């Protein structure tokens, strides 16, 4: 079983960097965050619905030769396999090769798509791939800053998504069945803040303020979850925290994609942030300690502290981006391109 879990992780590892790279390749910088929000919303709906479906499948435990958890693997594995097969034809190519995709764009429409991206950042066609070209991308400090923010972000997301039923059951006194159902509701709710905040970010061309606002919402949510006395107030805190970290997933993706140009730098950044996102997930699985119920002080403190750090990094990046844009405007330096400006 451990070996199968390792295989599952290996095959899943390329999904998010691949999707992030494709989205950032197809859309202009002022359009990206809202598209990342749609991607995240789809995951949320599947995650929440999957929890409810798993709850139902687990009830079969006493009425069949197979265990409930075995039905979970069979049903979800079958659905994932079918979708994966369909995706081979459904997934589109990069803009310059879009006419090759299955019934997607004709040659004229492909040229329009390419022209949009060239006008925005002039990086449709990649340079020749080489090891030195890949390693050169790691000289950019932004890659490390964005990666570290994703690490800090996923400390919270893993703790909440995997341990929310435990928090509801042990920390708030709900039954096991009620905890499973109640754990799904915040994820359905989170679709609203991620879409709204992302639309605002794209509409007004801002990234940092949206991230900081979401961080404050998460800090308030975890404060309620960790220190409020009433169960209702603590559950409201779960909603605030879940909506905030989900919104920041799209916001951080929009932030890095808006300030990175070049196909290989995008690919390297997407891979780096995904790797650090995974490391954050590993670390996040240790911060919810059962013996700290019902307050979970370690998880509360680390979650709040991690988002204070995100605010600090965003502030530093914003100052750097502002100064760099100002230097380019005065003709004192050249950024990623002649007409490129950082988005903050």
Task: Please tell me what each predicted stretch does.
Residues 33-65, 74-80, 270-284:
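Glycine-rich segments within core transmembrane alpha-helices of 12-TM secondary carriers
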Residues 209-223:
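Structural signature of the two symmetry-related core transmembrane helices
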Residues 2-7, 232-240:
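Paired small-residue
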Residues 14-27, 247-262:
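Intracellular juxtamembrane helix-capping segments at the cytosolic ends
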Residues 53-64, 168-169, 200-202, 287-295:
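Interfacial helix-cap and linker-helix signal at transmembrane-aqueous boundaries
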Residues 4-41:
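Cytoplasmic helix-loop-helix junction between adjacent transmembrane helices
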Residues 132-199, 249, 253, 285:
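Extracytoplasmic gate region of multi-pass secondary transporters
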Residues 88-123, 266, 272, 295-344:
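Intracellular terminal tails of multi-pass secondary transporters
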């Amino acid at each position: 079983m451990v070996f199968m879990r390792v295989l599952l992780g290996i095959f899943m590892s390329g999904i998010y960097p691949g999707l992030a790279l494709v989205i950032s390749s197809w859309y202009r910088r002022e359009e990206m965050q809202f598209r990342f929000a749609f991607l995240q919303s789809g995951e949320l709906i599947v995650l929440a619905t999957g929890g409810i479906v798993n709850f139902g499948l687990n009830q079969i435990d006493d009425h069949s030769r197979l265990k409930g958890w075995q039905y979970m693997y069979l049903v979800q594995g079958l659905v994932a396999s079918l979708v994966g097969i369909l995706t081979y034809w459904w997934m589109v190519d990069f803009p310059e090769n879009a006419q090759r995709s299955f019934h997607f764009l004709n040659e004229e429409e492909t040229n329009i798509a390419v022209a949009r991206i060239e006008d925005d950042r002039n990086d449709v066609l990649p340079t020749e791939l080489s090891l030195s070209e890949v390693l050169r991308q790691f000289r950019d400090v932004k890659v490390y800053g964005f990666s570290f923010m994703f690490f800090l972000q996923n400390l919270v997301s893993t703790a909440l998504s995997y341990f929310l039923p435990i928090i509801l059951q042990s920390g708030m006194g709900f039954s096991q069945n009620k905890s499973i159902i109640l754990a799904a509701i915040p994820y359905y709710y989170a679709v609203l803040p991620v879409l709204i905040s992302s639309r605002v970010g794209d509409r007004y061309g801002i990234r940092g303020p949206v991230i900081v606002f979401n961080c404050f919402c998460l800090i308030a949510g975890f404060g309620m979850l960790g220190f409020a006395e009433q169960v209702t107030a603590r559950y409201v805190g779960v909603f605030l925290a879940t909506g905030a970290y989900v919104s920041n997933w799209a916001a951080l993706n929009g932030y890095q994609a808006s300030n990175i140009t070049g196909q290989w730098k995008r690919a390297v950044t997407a891979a780096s942030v995904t790797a650090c996102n995974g490391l954050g997930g590993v670390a996040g699985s240790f911060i919810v300690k059962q013996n700290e119920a019902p307050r979970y002080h370690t998880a509360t403190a680390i979650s709040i502290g991690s988002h204070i750090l995100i605010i600090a990094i965003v502030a530093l990046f914003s100052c750097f981006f502002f100064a760099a844009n100002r230097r380019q405007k005065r003709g004192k330096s050249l950024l990623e391109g002649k007409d490129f400006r950082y988005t903050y």
